[in-house]
Amino acid sequence: MTTPRNSTAAVAFVMLASRAAFAQAPPAYRADDLGTLGGTYLLAAAMNNNGDIVGSGTVADGTLHAFRWTRAGGLEDLGLFGGIESQASGINDRGDILGFYFDAAFVTHPFILPAGGTMQALDGVFQPSALATNDWFTGMSSNGRAFRAIPGGVVEDISAFISFGSAINASGATAGWSWHADPADEQPTAFRYTDGAGFVDLGTFGGPSSYAYGINAAGTVVGAADTSLGVWHAYRAVPGAALQDLGVLRTGGVSRSVANAVNDAGDVVGTAEGGGSLTAFRYTDDRGLIDLAPLVPVAARAHGALYSAVAINAQKAIVAIYSDPNGEFRSELLTPRDDVPAPVVSNVSADPRVLMPPNGRMVPVYVTVDVADEYDDSPACTIVSVTDSAGPRFGSNQDVAITGPLSVNLRAKWHEGDNRIYRLNISCVNALGGATAASTVVRVSNR
C-alpha cells in the first residue's frame, strides 16, 4: 500500500472510475516462476507455441537434470536417460523434446524424446541445439560442423569449417555461426543456410565477429554482431537485407545487446545492458527496444533481477531468466496482459473535511490516498480538478487554488441554502500509464 499521507478510517466518499491508459503504454506481463527440481538452479532453453518449456536444472544433490514445464502439469523432471547428467535444448509444437545426456566418461549422447514416446538416440551428432515442428533439428555434428537433419535421416553438414547450428525452422532453414578456415581462425561470423541460397555469411557491424541465435518461419535471423568499437549489438536479419541494428537500452558509454530469439511476427527478445547491469529486453517495430523489468509485477521483481529473455512464441509469451538473491539463475514465463493494469484506490480523504465560515478565509486542505499497485511501488496521485457546488453564480475561480499534488486551498464561504460542497477529483497513475480516478468532498458548513 502507498499512502502519500497517513490515513485512518474511510472518512470521505470514494468514487472509483473506470481505468484508463496512455495509448502508447507498453504491455504488462503476468509472471509464472517455473520453480526448481529441488536444487538452486533452473535454466530454460526453449519454448514452443503452446507455452511448453524445456531446459535443465539441478536436483538436491547438484546433479543437472533435463526438465519440461507445462501450464497444466507444472515442472517435470525428465530424468537422466541412463547417464549422469542430462539437458533439454529444444521442443517443437508437437511436444517432441531434443536433448542430450552425459555418460560416466562425460561422452555426449544426443536424443529426441517424442511426445508420448520413448527416447531415440541421434547418431552422428555431438550436441543438438534446436528442433523444428516437422522434426528438422540442428546443432554441432560429431566432426565439429553445423548440421541439419531429421531423426533417422542423414546428418547434413552445412559448413566446411568448425561451426555450430543454433536455430532451425520447419523449412530446414538454419542459423548459427562458423569460422572460415581449418584450423579455426580467430573470429566466427553468423550464417543463414537455406536450400535456395545455400550458405550465406551475415556479416557484422564493422567488427570482426557475429553470432546467430534464432530464426523464424520467414528465415529472419537474430543474434549479435560486433561493431567497429568492439561492442555487441543485437541484430535482426531479414532474407535479402543487411543486418538491422536493434540498438541498446542505455545511451552514453559502453552499452551492449544480444538478441536470442524471434517469433514469426518478427518480435525479438534478448539481453541488454541497462543502467550498468544486464536485463531482458523485447523489440517490436512499433516500440523498439524496451526493458522488460518494469513490465513484470513487483512481487516477481522481488525474486531477483531479470537477466535475459531466451524465447518468445506466437502468443508473445516470453521465457525470461533472472538471478535470485544468491546469484543463482532461475526461469519464469512472462505472459502478456490484454489490459493495462491500473492502481487500486481503497480510500481518499481530506483534512479538514469541513470548513467553518463565515470569515471567507482560504483554508489549506490536504488529501490522503490509500493506493496499491501490482506493478508500481509508488503510483503518482494528484488533484486534477475541483468542482464547486456553488456554481458560477456564487462561486469564483479565486475560491480554489491547487497548491501541490495532494494539497489545495479552498475558500471557507457558503451561499444561502444547502451546504457548499467542493469535490476534489484525483487521478492515480502508475509507471505503465494505467490510471484510476477517485474523488473526495470537502463541505463548507452553513451553521
Report each predicted region and the residues it spans:
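Residue-level hotspots at or immediately adjacent to binding/recognition sites across diverse folds
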Residues: Q24-D338
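N-terminal signal peptide c-region/cleavage motif recognized by signal peptidases
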Residues: S18-A20
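Bacterial N-terminal signal peptides that target proteins for export
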Residues: M1-A10
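Context-gated lysine
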Residues: M15, N134, N313-K316, K413, ...
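Proline-threonine-serine-rich low-complexity tracts
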Residues: D338-R447
